[in-house]
Each structure stands twice: as C-alpha cells, then as structure tokens.
Amino acid sequence: MTRHAHSTDRTALAGERGFTIIELLVAVTIMLVITGAIFAIVDPSRSTARAQPEVTDQNTRMRVGLDTLSKDLVMAGAGTYSGAIAGGLANFFAPIVPFRMGTLYPAEYLDRFHPDRITIAYVPNTAAQTRVRDAMPQPSSEIKVDAQPGCPAGDALCGFREGMRVVIFDDSGAYDFFTVTEVQTDALHLQHRPPINPDDFSKAYTPSENARIAQVETHTYFRDPATNQLMHYWGDNNPPEPVTDQIVDLRFEYFGDPEPPTAPRPLPGGTNCLFDGAGVNQLPILPSNGSSLVELTPAMLSDGPFCGNVPNQYDADLYRIRRVRVTMRVQTGLRD
C-alpha cells in the first residue's frame, strides 16, 4: 500500500512541470519576430496614408497650373472680328512672347528669351474694337475712334470705358498696351506703361497704316524660384498673383511654321521687319524634313530681325509660332 501511494505522488509532480529557460527564450524570440513583422507591415501603410493626401494635392496643383495655362494659350492671338477690321493679332504683332511684359517689367524685352516665362495676348469677346479715325499728332495725343458697324448703338466710343485694358496696333508691327483713364464724347484719354514716358506710346498711330484699337487681355506666366510658385501677371500696376505652389520647374518650348510669315505687310514701297522695299520676305524657309512644324530654338527667337518699337520689340520669328509645349514639374509638401 505504501509503495502504491508513493507512485501516485510522483505522477502528480511530473504533470506540474514548467518551461525551461531555453524554451522561454525560444518563445520570446518567436514572439518578437512575429511582432516585428507586424510592425514592418503596418509602418509602410502608415507612411502611405500620410503621403496619399500629398499625392492628391500634387495632382491638383499640376491640374490647376496646366488648365490655367491651357485656357489662355488656346485663346492666344484671337483678334478683332467686327466688320472690315477683322483679323487675328498674329497678322499685326506677335501675340506670344517668351518674356514678361507690362508696367512692372518695362525692360525685359531686352533679354529676348526666357525658357520659364511667357506673355500671351488676345482680344476677348467684346464690342470695344474699331479703327483709329484721325492721325495722332504726337505719341502722347488722345485717340479718336470710328463708330463703325458693330459698335453699340448710340455709343460714339464703341464700347470703350474707363479702366479698360486696350491694345493699339497697325500694319508696321508696332503695338502698345494701355489703360483707358478718361473718356470723352469722341476721344479716349489714355495711360499706358513706362519706361519712356508714362503718357507716350511707342509711336504716333495713323489711319494710313491701318491703325486699330481693341479691348485686350494679356496674361504673363512665370515661375518664382524664391517661392516655387506659378505666378500670373495682368500687365498693369498690380503685383503678380500666385496660381499654384510647389512648382520646381517650368519650361516653354515653341514650334512653328517653317514657311516665313506673310503678314504684316508694309505700305507699297515701305519696309518692316519682314519685307524689304521690293516686297521680298527677309526670313528664310526653315529645314523641316517634311514636318508641318519645326522647333523654334531660343537662338532663333532672339537673334533678330526685331519688329515693333521700343519698348515693345520682339523677334520676327515669333510670328511663326503655332504650338507651345508646357513642361511643369511639381513636388509634394512632405519634408520627411
């Protein structure tokens, strides 16, 4: 009986054995490996969750920037469309130039070309478009206009109003942007940008050179390297406005007609930047290898001959432009 009781106690003790140190270490190691694997899976997901809103913002910045530029590029060169003065701006002056224009940048035309800057001009849907009626005695003289068919009934000023942005241009390739500061019965008192004289145009415009006047929109776009912002400028005294941010690179490339432009033409026997006194075009035919458009390099758009008058001069090859390629690189706002 005693021996049997002793055997039962040994069996009970054997069933209460614990883990050895080695077994415990193995178990802890397995637990750490599994926990580490879980964190390795969770942490990238957390980073992705943090980055996803920035990616969305990045796409939005890109879309806003390109949509804004595209809207104005599509309109570039749209000209007058009323009666006998109908015609695109490219028949008179270059509506796209690779530099900033306006009151705040009076001398940038001297640089001729900037790959990250562009100024676009076009006539919007407006009744304010007509001929210059009388020759201007001086570049600072007031402008008298015709109330031609298409002008608002009973409006001798053909819809021009104080504060309106306007362009005056003619067949010589000259033009000036300005702001109407005062209106009278049959004359516009004009103000336009420096630097020569705030009250003077670059020339005295005359009906004999087919001078005309119209409401205009000008849009200048460029990248501010200090803030990495795409900037928009209206051409007046107001400072540029940001369109979108985190723009780390902006490039404009130009493609044009290999054939030389055929307008504007000077008066018979006259000359301009395109034609000599015999009416012969001075610009060459560009090598194209059969393509309808050729790339217009920075050198081609800055080597002359130059059209227009100071301070609104531009390279004659800008008349060739038919397509503009925009390259924009955007970054996220994340810093880690």
Each PLM stretch: what is its role?
Residues 1-14:
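N-terminal secretory signal peptides that target proteins for export/translocation
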Residues 3, 17-70, 74-76:
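Aliphatic-rich helix starts adjacent to a transmembrane/signal segment
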Residues 12, 32, 212-214:
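Short linear sequence motifs
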Residues 12-13, 29, 45, 49-51, ...:
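Short, well-ordered helical secondary-structure segments
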Residues 14-17, 320-322:
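Residue-level preference for short coil/turn positions at secondary-structure junctions
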Residues 62-320, 325-327, 333-335:
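N-terminal pilin/flagellin-like segments and related low-complexity appendage regions
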